[in-house]
């Protein structure tokens, strides 16, 4: 935990030791080398710089950051945005914008450019799919999601999918004079930031953190009348894995003229079938589908049964940032084994949930598989996802330091992964009295541990958690 705090507080000891990290938060070595090359070539030493892929994303970043940010197209479709290093607030705003909307250049594209400019001898050897990977991935996803292949768009990251979907819905509903947005439940950090930062002055954002009271949610939606634009939720929610009568919410949103956006990333489209309830599905494919956790990619799917299908499909397509070709090729290889791996994750997660639920060291446990509503959306019996969240009776820090699994902010990998979720996603909330009070109000424990259960032999997984729990109490 000392290293987690050190990362959040940017301690030189920790930052120097980190060779890599989640790509939207930690700049990959290949991207860093590419930045150094471009900065020297363009004579921009002493400037704060980021890379953005695609003209659509470029325009959005420039619109958001305003004056003071300049741009150079350093390679075809690749843009170097830069600002005064002394303007700390603008430099931070620029970095955060690229993080939120997921539009950066990632490692495979950076590697290709390093090779192009003779800065790297060759490509890292890896197995990829042959043939038309884009079509193959879209075909498989369409089968899982329940739509046509043409209704699925691949994006450069999961956040790019969320942002592109948001912009598409926003364009549709602004044209209809609808301005009221509603967030149901807790949203992932950057998803929430997109809603807060990119709505216009004439648009509003309200929150309903308790997704269990569907009657109250429907009455709230009714009050917006003809102004309801969209309702956004993760289903199941992250990190508490909450589910509800989503079909009732969907019916109400449609009755009131809104658009329902659902993100099923925490369980994946391989486990849950939510498109029948949504107008728009947005999801990360970095989780579950890329079981090695080594591909940045997302997907958007428009429900053919939505009354807004034609216009929404056009709006989303106009706003999306496509996935990079080599990322798709790698994903095309991994997606072939993903269903088998994901089924094993679900099976192991169910067994670990049963073990943790009766362990005296666990105070509270959250698991989608224990919900009475999951069966209505599960792809098949036992499709529960890999994620479990727990509150501990004992010392969280002792447990975290002792548990011998990989630690990091992602999930849905073939290897078990664990993180102190609120410390990594909302460090500002867990380190202030005001923040902790807010978390208590919405029912999230600051010391919550989120576990993504992998495909290792179950007995080995249980033994690791048993040892760490015994130490913590």
Which role does the model predict for each range below?
Residues 144, 148-361, 366:
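Conserved PLP-enzyme active-site core in the AAT-like
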Residues 88, 394-401, 458-463:
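Short, conserved charged micro-motifs
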Residues 311-312, 398-406, 464-469:
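Short amphipathic alpha-helices in soluble, non-transmembrane regions
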Residues 3-22, 30, 315-398, 402-403:
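Structural motif of enzymes handling amino- and sulfur-group chemistry
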Residues 1-160, 168-170, 184-200, 216:
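Conserved N-terminal alpha-helix of the aminotransferase class I/II PLP-enzyme fold
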Residues 373-380, 422-446:
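Active-site-adjacent capping/gating segments
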Residues 403-435:
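Conserved PLP cofactor-binding pocket of PLP-dependent enzymes
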């Amino acid at each position: 935990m000392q290293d987690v705090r050190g990362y959040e507080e940017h301690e030189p000891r920790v930052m120097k030791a980190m060779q890599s990290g989640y790509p939207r938060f930690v700049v990959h070595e290949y991207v860093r080398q590419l930045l150094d090359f471009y900065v020297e070539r363009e004579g921009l030493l002493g400037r704060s710089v980021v890379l953005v892929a695609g003209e659509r994303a470029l325009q959005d970043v420039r619109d958001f950051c305003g004056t003071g940010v300049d741009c150079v197209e350093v390679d075809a479709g690749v843009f170097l945005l830069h600002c005064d290093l002394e303007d700390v607030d603008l430099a931070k705003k620029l970095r955060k914008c690229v993080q939120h909307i997921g539009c950066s250049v990632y490692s495979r594209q950076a590697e290709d450019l390093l090779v192009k400019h003779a800065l790297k001898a060759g490509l890292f050897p890896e197995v990829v799919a042959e043939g038309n990977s884009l079509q193959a991935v879209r075909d498989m996803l369409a089968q899982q999601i329940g739509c046509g292949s043409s209704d699925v768009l691949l994006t450069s990251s999961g956040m790019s999918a969320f942002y592109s979907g948001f912009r598409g819905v926003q364009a549709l509903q602004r044209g209809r004079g609808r301005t009221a947005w509603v967030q149901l439940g807790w949203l992932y950090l950057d998803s929430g930031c997109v809603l807060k930062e990119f709505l216009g002055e004439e648009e509003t954002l309200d929150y309903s953190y308790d997704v269990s009271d569907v009657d109250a949610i429907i009455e709230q939606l009714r009050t917006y009348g003809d102004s309801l634009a969209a309702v956004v939720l993760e289903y199941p929610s992250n990190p508490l894995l909450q589910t509800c009568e989503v079909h009732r919410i969907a019916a109400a949103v449609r009755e009131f003229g809104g658009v329902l956006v659902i993100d099923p990333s925490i369980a994946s489209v391989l486990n849950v079938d939510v498109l029948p309830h949504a107008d728009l599905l947005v999801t990360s494919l970095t989780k579950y589908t890329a079981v090695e956790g080594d591909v940045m990619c997302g997907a958007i799917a428009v429900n053919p049964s939505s009354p807004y299908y034609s216009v929404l499909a056009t709006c989303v397509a106009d706003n999306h940032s496509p996935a990079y070709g080599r990322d798709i090729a790698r994903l095309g290889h991994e997606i072939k084994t993903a269903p088998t791996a994901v089924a094993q994750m679900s099976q192991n997660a169910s067994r670990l949930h049963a073990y943790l639920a009766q362990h005296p060291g666990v105070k509270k446990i959250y698991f989608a598989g224990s919900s009475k509503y999951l069966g209505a959306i599960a792809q098949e019996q036992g499709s529960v996802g890999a994620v479990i969240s727990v509150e501990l009776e004992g010392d969280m820090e002792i447990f975290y330091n002792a548990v011998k699994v990989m630690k990091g902010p992602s999930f849905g990998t073939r290897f078990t992964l664990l993180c102190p979720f609120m410390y990594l996603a909302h460090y500002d909330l867990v380190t202030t009295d005001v923040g902790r009070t807010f978390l208590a109000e919405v029912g999230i424990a600051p010391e919550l541990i989120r576990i993504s259960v992998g495909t290792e032999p179950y007995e080995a997984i249980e033994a690791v958690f048993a040892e760490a729990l015994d130490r913590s109490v």
